[in-house]
From Swiss-Prot:
One of its GO terms (cellular component) is proton-transporting ATP synthase complex. The chain crosses the membrane at residues 12-32. Keywords: ATP synthesis, Cell inner membrane, Cell membrane, CF(0), Hydrogen ion transport, Ion transport, Membrane, Transmembrane, Transmembrane helix, Transport. Pfam families: ATP-synt_B (PF00430). It is a single-pass membrane protein. InterPro entries: ATP_synth_B-like_membr_sf, ATP_synth_b/b'su_bac/chlpt, ATP_synth_F0_bsu_bac, ATP_synthase_B_chain. Belongs to the ATPase B chain family. F(1)F(0) ATP synthase produces ATP from ADP in the presence of a proton or sodium gradient. F-type ATPases consist of two structural domains, F(1) containing the extramembraneous catalytic core and F(0) containing the membrane proton channel, linked together by a central stalk and a peripheral stalk. During catalysis, ATP synthesis in the catalytic domain of F(1) is coupled via a rotary mechanism of the central stalk subunits to proton translocation. It is found in: Cell inner membrane. F-type ATPases have 2 components, F(1) - the catalytic core - and F(0) - the membrane proton channel. F(1) has five subunits: alpha(3), beta(3), gamma(1), delta(1), epsilon(1). F(0) has three main subunits: a(1), b(2) and c(10-14). The alpha and beta chains form an alternating ring which encloses part of the gamma chain. F(1) is attached to F(0) by a central stalk formed by the gamma and epsilon chains, while a peripheral stalk is formed by the delta and b chains. This is ATP synthase subunit b. One of its GO terms (molecular function) is proton-transporting ATPase activity, rotational mechanism. The keyword Lipid metabolism does not apply.
Length: 160
């Protein structure tokens, strides 16, 4: 009986131990495990959402990058067009300035030519008057007249 009482005591203590574990240890462990499983599943769902959100944001970033490239190309194209327009305007202005300078130079040349021509005419007329005066003064001697005329001709030819 001693053996039966021991087995009975051990059975009772085991049942009490199981009951105690079920009441105070098992359910808190199970609730902690379930809570952690719920957190893990929530974190997995959150990670999945974050991954899809990341893919969406990445796609939006790529789209924005493409749009920025297109816009940059348009800006470059407009800048090149503006550059060409500025170059053409500068070329046109340079041509106008060139023609203005050339016309001023031509006018200056014409003016100088006219001034020099008038001055030469004046000098020639003075020389003719001077020569005529000398011829008249020396008209007595015919030979002197010929020498004077030759001198005048030589003088005129040296001044040209």
């Amino acid at each position: 009986m001693n053996l039966n009482a021991t087995i009975l005591g051990q059975t009772i203590s085991f049942v009490l131990f199981v009951w105690f574990c079920m009441k105070y240890v098992w359910y808190p462990f199970i609730s902690i495990i379930e809570k952690r499983q719920k957190e893990i599943s929530d974190n997995l769902v959150s990670a999945t959402h974050a991954k899809t959100e990341s893919e969406r944001v990445n796609a939006e970033a790529l789209l924005c990058l493409r749009q920025a490239r297109v816009k940059a190309q348009e800006i470059i194209k407009q800048a090149n067009k503006c550059k060409m327009q500025i170059i053409n305007e500068a070329k046109h202005e340079a041509e106008k300035e060139q023609s203005r300078i050339l016309s001023q130079a031509r006018e200056q040349i014409i003016y100088e030519r006219k001034r020099v021509t008038d001055e030469l005419r004046k000098q020639i007329s003075e020389l003719v008057i001077e020569g005529t005066e000398k011829v008249i003064e020396h008209s007595i001697n015919e030979m002197i007249d010929i020498d004077l005329l030759n001198n005048i001709i030589n003088t005129l030819s040296y001044k040209d």
